[in-house]
Amino acid sequence: MNSLNIFLKNLDHNFYTIKSKLKNSTKLIGVVKANAYGSDSLIIAKRLESLGIDMIAVAYTSEGIYLKKNKINIPILVFYPQLESLKELYKYRLEPAIYSKLIFKKFNELIEEKSYKKYPIHIKYNTGLNRIGFSSNETTWIVKSLNKSSLALKSVYSHLSMSEEKKPSKISEKQINVFKNIIENY
Protein backbone atom coordinates (compact mmCIF):
# COMPACT_ATOMS: atom_id res chain seq x y z
CA MET A 1 0.00 0.00 0.00
CA ASN A 2 1.26 3.45 -0.91
CA SER A 3 1.05 6.36 1.48
CA LEU A 4 1.65 10.07 1.37
CA ASN A 5 2.83 12.01 4.39
CA ILE A 6 1.98 15.69 4.49
CA PHE A 7 4.04 17.80 6.86
CA LEU A 8 1.89 20.81 7.59
CA LYS A 9 4.76 22.53 9.39
CA ASN A 10 6.60 22.56 6.05
CA LEU A 11 3.55 24.17 4.46
CA ASP A 12 3.58 26.76 7.26
CA HIS A 13 7.27 27.45 6.64
CA ASN A 14 6.74 27.83 2.89
CA PHE A 15 3.77 30.15 3.43
CA TYR A 16 5.70 32.44 5.77
CA THR A 17 8.78 32.39 3.53
CA ILE A 18 6.76 33.47 0.50
CA LYS A 19 4.75 36.02 2.51
CA SER A 20 7.98 37.59 3.83
CA LYS A 21 9.10 38.33 0.26
CA LEU A 22 5.89 40.16 -0.69
CA LYS A 23 4.63 43.66 -0.02
CA ASN A 24 2.02 43.75 2.75
CA SER A 25 -0.58 44.82 0.19
CA THR A 26 0.07 41.78 -2.04
CA LYS A 27 -2.66 39.14 -1.92
CA LEU A 28 -1.69 35.48 -1.82
CA ILE A 29 -3.75 32.68 -3.37
CA GLY A 30 -3.34 29.04 -2.37
CA VAL A 31 -4.03 26.68 -5.26
CA VAL A 32 -5.67 23.44 -4.12
CA LYS A 33 -7.08 22.19 -7.43
CA ALA A 34 -7.19 18.45 -8.14
CA ASN A 35 -7.55 17.67 -4.43
CA ALA A 36 -4.49 19.81 -3.70
CA TYR A 37 -2.55 17.79 -6.26
CA GLY A 38 -3.49 14.59 -4.43
CA SER A 39 -2.71 15.75 -0.91
CA ASP A 40 -6.29 16.52 0.33
CA SER A 41 -7.66 19.91 -0.60
CA LEU A 42 -9.71 20.31 2.58
CA ILE A 43 -6.77 19.75 4.93
CA ILE A 44 -4.55 22.09 2.91
CA ALA A 45 -7.26 24.75 2.49
CA LYS A 46 -8.06 24.74 6.22
CA ARG A 47 -4.40 25.08 7.08
CA LEU A 48 -3.86 27.90 4.59
CA GLU A 49 -6.98 29.67 5.87
CA SER A 50 -5.67 29.42 9.45
CA LEU A 51 -2.35 30.91 8.30
CA GLY A 52 -4.13 33.92 6.79
CA ILE A 53 -4.07 33.15 3.08
CA ASP A 54 -6.22 35.65 1.19
CA MET A 55 -7.91 33.25 -1.20
CA ILE A 56 -8.06 29.62 -2.30
CA ALA A 57 -8.17 28.58 -5.97
CA VAL A 58 -9.64 25.43 -7.48
CA ALA A 59 -10.09 24.19 -11.02
CA TYR A 60 -13.83 23.52 -11.09
CA THR A 61 -16.99 24.70 -9.36
CA SER A 62 -17.57 21.29 -7.74
CA GLU A 63 -14.23 21.58 -5.93
CA GLY A 64 -15.17 25.02 -4.62
CA ILE A 65 -18.59 23.81 -3.45
CA TYR A 66 -16.92 20.96 -1.56
CA LEU A 67 -14.70 23.44 0.28
CA LYS A 68 -17.58 25.84 1.03
CA LYS A 69 -19.72 22.98 2.37
CA ASN A 70 -16.81 22.07 4.63
CA LYS A 71 -16.61 25.54 6.16
CA ILE A 72 -13.87 27.22 4.15
CA ASN A 73 -14.89 30.86 4.57
CA ILE A 74 -12.31 32.78 2.56
CA PRO A 75 -12.96 33.62 -1.11
CA ILE A 76 -12.57 30.75 -3.56
CA LEU A 77 -11.48 31.40 -7.15
CA VAL A 78 -12.65 28.89 -9.78
CA PHE A 79 -10.17 28.72 -12.67
CA TYR A 80 -12.42 26.93 -15.20
CA PRO A 81 -16.09 27.73 -14.61
CA GLN A 82 -18.32 25.95 -17.11
CA LEU A 83 -21.61 27.33 -18.47
CA GLU A 84 -23.63 24.58 -16.79
CA SER A 85 -22.12 25.37 -13.37
CA LEU A 86 -22.59 29.15 -13.27
CA LYS A 87 -25.77 29.01 -11.14
CA GLU A 88 -24.06 26.81 -8.56
CA LEU A 89 -21.00 29.03 -8.64
CA TYR A 90 -23.23 32.00 -7.80
CA LYS A 91 -25.20 30.07 -5.16
CA TYR A 92 -22.02 29.31 -3.21
CA ARG A 93 -20.52 32.77 -3.86
CA LEU A 94 -17.49 31.37 -5.63
CA GLU A 95 -15.45 33.79 -7.73
CA PRO A 96 -15.06 32.86 -11.39
CA ALA A 97 -12.08 33.32 -13.62
CA ILE A 98 -13.63 34.75 -16.76
CA TYR A 99 -11.71 33.52 -19.79
CA SER A 100 -14.07 34.06 -22.74
CA LYS A 101 -16.70 36.49 -24.00
CA LEU A 102 -19.35 33.77 -23.73
CA ILE A 103 -18.61 33.07 -20.05
CA PHE A 104 -18.49 36.82 -19.37
CA LYS A 105 -21.86 37.46 -21.03
CA LYS A 106 -23.63 34.45 -19.49
CA PHE A 107 -22.33 35.12 -15.99
CA ASN A 108 -23.21 38.80 -16.18
CA GLU A 109 -26.75 37.89 -17.33
CA LEU A 110 -27.10 35.60 -14.32
CA ILE A 111 -25.82 38.25 -11.91
CA GLU A 112 -28.16 40.89 -13.35
CA GLU A 113 -31.06 38.44 -13.11
CA LYS A 114 -30.24 38.03 -9.40
CA SER A 115 -30.02 41.85 -9.00
CA TYR A 116 -26.55 41.46 -7.50
CA LYS A 117 -24.31 44.49 -7.85
CA LYS A 118 -20.58 44.22 -8.42
CA TYR A 119 -20.02 40.47 -8.12
CA PRO A 120 -16.26 39.81 -7.91
CA ILE A 121 -14.62 38.19 -10.93
CA HIS A 122 -11.10 37.55 -12.20
CA ILE A 123 -10.00 37.96 -15.81
CA LYS A 124 -7.72 35.30 -17.28
CA TYR A 125 -5.48 36.22 -20.21
CA ASN A 126 -3.70 33.88 -22.57
CA THR A 127 -0.24 35.39 -22.95
CA GLY A 128 1.38 32.37 -24.56
CA LEU A 129 0.43 29.12 -22.82
CA ASN A 130 -2.37 28.82 -25.40
CA ARG A 131 -4.92 26.96 -23.31
CA ILE A 132 -7.68 29.36 -22.34
CA GLY A 133 -8.01 33.05 -21.74
CA PHE A 134 -8.64 36.32 -23.46
CA SER A 135 -6.12 37.59 -25.98
CA SER A 136 -4.53 40.98 -25.45
CA ASN A 137 -6.53 42.45 -28.35
CA GLU A 138 -9.77 41.82 -26.41
CA THR A 139 -8.82 44.16 -23.56
CA THR A 140 -10.81 47.13 -24.84
CA TRP A 141 -13.93 44.95 -25.09
CA ILE A 142 -13.37 43.65 -21.55
CA VAL A 143 -12.91 47.11 -20.02
CA LYS A 144 -15.99 48.51 -21.80
CA SER A 145 -18.05 45.45 -20.87
CA LEU A 146 -16.98 45.62 -17.23
CA ASN A 147 -18.00 49.27 -17.03
CA LYS A 148 -21.54 48.38 -18.20
CA SER A 149 -21.87 45.18 -16.15
CA SER A 150 -22.88 44.02 -12.69
CA LEU A 151 -19.41 42.51 -12.29
CA ALA A 152 -16.47 43.87 -10.29
CA LEU A 153 -12.92 43.17 -11.40
CA LYS A 154 -10.94 41.68 -8.53
CA SER A 155 -7.84 40.55 -10.40
CA VAL A 156 -6.27 40.05 -13.80
CA TYR A 157 -3.89 37.15 -14.30
CA SER A 158 -2.15 34.87 -16.74
CA HIS A 159 -0.14 31.66 -16.55
CA LEU A 160 3.51 31.51 -17.58
CA SER A 161 4.35 28.57 -19.80
CA MET A 162 7.74 28.04 -18.13
CA SER A 163 7.05 29.30 -14.60
CA GLU A 164 9.20 26.70 -12.84
CA GLU A 165 12.45 28.06 -14.28
CA LYS A 166 14.67 30.00 -11.84
CA LYS A 167 15.52 32.64 -14.43
CA PRO A 168 12.80 33.77 -16.83
CA SER A 169 13.17 32.23 -20.28
CA LYS A 170 12.77 34.27 -23.46
CA ILE A 171 9.24 32.87 -23.74
CA SER A 172 8.40 33.88 -20.16
CA GLU A 173 9.88 37.35 -20.69
CA LYS A 174 7.70 37.78 -23.77
CA GLN A 175 4.62 36.68 -21.79
CA ILE A 176 5.49 39.08 -18.96
CA ASN A 177 5.82 41.96 -21.43
CA VAL A 178 2.48 41.10 -23.05
CA PHE A 179 0.88 41.01 -19.59
CA LYS A 180 2.41 44.36 -18.58
CA ASN A 181 0.97 45.92 -21.74
CA ILE A 182 -2.45 44.48 -20.91
CA ILE A 183 -2.36 45.82 -17.34
CA GLU A 184 -1.70 49.36 -18.59
CA ASN A 185 -5.23 49.32 -20.05
CA TYR A 186 -6.95 48.80 -16.68
Label each residue range with its predicted role:
Residues 2-6, 10, 26-186:
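Active-site-proximal beta-alpha core segment in soluble small-molecule metabolic enzymes
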Residues 15:
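Histidine/acidic residue-rich metal-binding segments in metalloenzymes
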Residues 21:
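Conserved PLP-enzyme active-site core in the AAT-like
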